[in-house]
């Protein structure tokens, strides 16, 4: 089997795993508008009448991507209090607990390997995580007869919430309302019933599944995607500029400098960022450095907040123009992109832009930067020299004091010696102040350099590709999606990346934001990778020439409800030659397993956040004392970071 066919089989396997795992729908009520063609039955006796089958079959065939046919077992009934826009409301919920892949056979036989647990039903319990893990680890083949076991699991996870088995039956919304009219707030019932229905798939899940389908059917895969799945490929580098940390405002640690090098030189790399080690700041540095080297960068994560934090660091901390960075996948994304294009297209004529691009300001800026960097090197060398000399003088004084004893005249000698040394060398504090001022001057010059680089990129794109940019704007203004797709199909998306090289997006929003073009970006950075399942990351990996996976293996992984039996069956179906564990492994596990060069794995080892007493436990027990505690200062050693307070009758 060739490398491409092996990769395609692995993608098809992960596609089915993801589809089975995300076949569950977070339904607050089986009577939701997302559900149609409901058919109820007592537990274990669901049959599909011919007229029902004839109605549902055309729907499933016509909307295979948008809708699915599901079998539901057990329902959690209760009243839920919610607060929206400052107004508290109480509503009755009828949430299915389990769902399965279903067929339109007359007699329904459950495929228990496809069992999924409805997240909404579990979220009704405060101890949701423990409940998820209980059902994930203990799914049973005879789920329809396990009334007592289910009640026991629900009660054990949260004993303060009463739940009882109800014998009530219902066949539609009206009969449900009648059966549970007097239900009390805070008490839940488990109803042993079955139902089948056509359910609308979530848009985000649908997008990932569609792109996985396209990948599985294709034969062109990016290097990072193949390497992540264990392919043995030779490294290839074409015109990649080496990393230059001098382009970044601020001071970087050695590990952060190594990360810059790794992002430039490695096709598949891993950045381990324990809490408080500046992970988001480092990602911002990585993106900015590659931007300054003329490359495009895609930053993705499952966590929307993590993406926003990185964007703020790039624009606010480093001052990169909003016109050079695009936060995609959000509700107002198309409007924001159109505004960006409007701003770019309103620039002055190409003659003026070219004159700006060739203006002497760029060379003058570099000359000033070189001068400041030289001054910094000299000032730092002088500081080290003074420090060592002061250290030597101090040792001499100590020896003199020890040898001559505590004579009165010795104090006068020490005072004279100290004054003589200070007058000749100056205070170390003065040297530090000089270095701080030089760093400030350097950072200001680098900020101007970044701004100049962004302007030059826009000017270059305007001069050579204004027509293409106008085409993108026309596509965004199109009233119908079909018209939009038709315009976009004739455009070169890489041109848009010339003027806006840095893009940030959630994994779920990627499909509606960027075309699935192999190696569209030079670099993709996948943040919070510990929480990312393998399948949802593949479309992002396909879009880049190089990839850096970022996260912390010590943090909690994503939770999957895919059963082991189902995963094993799918693995056998596709005859996988490489073991891929979708259920238990995240993308970061895959990176740790398949990265072969140790130089492609970097750990940020300087902790800046917590007091030493707080982080020391984690450092010693989880990170093998590899973290350097940058908060460990003499002024903090006298403070107690942890206090034990005894509370009576607590």
Model-derived features: positions:
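Structural motif
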Residues: 270, 298-300, 503-504, 525, ...
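Conserved ATP-binding/catalytic motifs of P-loop helicase motor domains
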Residues: 175, 200, 275, 280-283, ...
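P-loop NTPase Walker
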Residues: 238-243, 247-381, 385-388, 392
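Conserved helicase motor core of SF1/SF2 NTP-dependent helicases
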Residues: 494-495, 508-523, 531-650
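Extended alpha-helical coiled-coil "stalk/arm" regions
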Residues: 375-416
């Amino acid at each position: 089997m060739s490398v491409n066919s092996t990769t395609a089989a692995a993608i098809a396997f992960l596609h089915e795993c993801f589809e089975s795992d995300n076949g569950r729908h977070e339904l607050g009520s089986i009577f939701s508008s997302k559900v149609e063609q409901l058919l109820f039955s007592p537990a274990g006796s669901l049959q599909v009448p011919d007229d029902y089958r004839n109605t549902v079959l055309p729907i499933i065939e016509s909307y295979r991507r948008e809708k699915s046919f599901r079998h539901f077992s057990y329902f959690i009934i209760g009243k839920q209090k919610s607060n929206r826009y400052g107004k508290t409301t109480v509503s009755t919920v009828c949430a299915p607990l389990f769902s399965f892949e279903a067929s339109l056979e007359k007699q329904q036989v459950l495929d228990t390997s496809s069992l999924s647990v409805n997240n909404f039903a579990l979220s009704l319990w405060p101890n949701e995580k423990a409940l998820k893990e209980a059902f994930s680890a203990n799914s049973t083949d005879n789920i329809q007869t396990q009334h007592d076991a289910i009640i026991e699991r629900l009660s054990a996870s949260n004993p303060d919430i009463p739940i009882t088995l109800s014998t009530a039956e219902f066949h539609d919304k009206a009969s449900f309302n009648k059966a549970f009219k007097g239900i009390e707030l805070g008490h839940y019932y488990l109803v042993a019933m079955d139902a089948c229905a056509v359910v609308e798939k979530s848009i985000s899940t649908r997008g990932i599944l569609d792109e996985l389908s396209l990948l599985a059917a294709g034969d062109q895969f990016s290097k990072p995607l193949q390497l992540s799945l264990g392919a043995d490929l030779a490294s290839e580098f074409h015109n990649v500029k080496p990393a230059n940390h001098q382009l970044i405002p601020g001071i970087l640690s050695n590990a952060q400098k190594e990360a810059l090098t790794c992002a430039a030189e490695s096709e598949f790399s891993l950045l381990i960022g324990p809490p408080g080690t500046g992970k988001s700041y480092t990602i911002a540095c990585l993106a900015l450095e590659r931007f300054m080297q003329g490359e495009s960068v895609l930053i993705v994560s499952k966590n929307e907040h993590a993406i926003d934090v990185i964007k703020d660091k790039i624009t606010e901390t480093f001052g990169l123009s909003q016109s050079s960075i695009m936060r995609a996948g959000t509700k107002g994304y198309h409007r924001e992109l159109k505004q960006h294009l409007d701003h770019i297209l309103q620039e002055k004529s190409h003659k003026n832009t070219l004159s700006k691009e060739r203006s002497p300001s760029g060379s003058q800026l570099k000359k000033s930067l070189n001068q400041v960097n030289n001054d910094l090197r000299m000032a730092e060398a002088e500081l080290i020299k003074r420090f060592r000399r002061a250290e030597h003088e101090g040792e001499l004084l100590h020896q003199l004091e020890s040898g001559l004893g505590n004579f009165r005249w010795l104090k006068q000698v020490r005072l004279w010696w100290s004054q003589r040394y200070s007058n000749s060398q100056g205070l170390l504090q003065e040297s530090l102040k000089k270095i701080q001022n030089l760093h400030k001057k350097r950072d200001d010059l680098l900020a101007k350099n970044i701004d100049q680089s962004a302007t030059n990129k826009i000017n270059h794109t305007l001069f050579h590709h204004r027509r293409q940019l106008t085409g993108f704007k026309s596509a965004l203004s199109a009233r119908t999606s079909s018209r939009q797709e038709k315009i976009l199909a004739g455009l070169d998306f890489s041109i848009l990346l010339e003027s806006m090289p840095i893009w940030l997006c959630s994994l779920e929003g990627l499909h509606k934001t960027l075309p699935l073009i192999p190696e569209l970006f030079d670099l993709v950075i996948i943040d919070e990778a510990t929480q990312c399942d393998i399948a949802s990351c593949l479309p992002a990996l396909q879009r880049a020439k190089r990839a850096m996976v970022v996260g912390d293996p010590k943090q909690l992984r994503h939770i999957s409800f895919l059963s082991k039996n189902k995963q094993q069956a799918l693995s056998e179906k596709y005859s996988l030659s490489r073991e891929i564990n979708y259920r238990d492994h995240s993308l970061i596990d895959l990176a740790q397993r398949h990265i072969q060069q140790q130089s492609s794995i970097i750990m940020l080892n300087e902790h800046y956040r917590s007091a030493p007493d707080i982080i020391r436990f984690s450092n010693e027990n989880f990170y093998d004392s590899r973290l350097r505690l940058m908060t460990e200062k003499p002024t903090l050693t006298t403070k107690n970071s942890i206090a034990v307070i005894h509370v009576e009758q607590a």
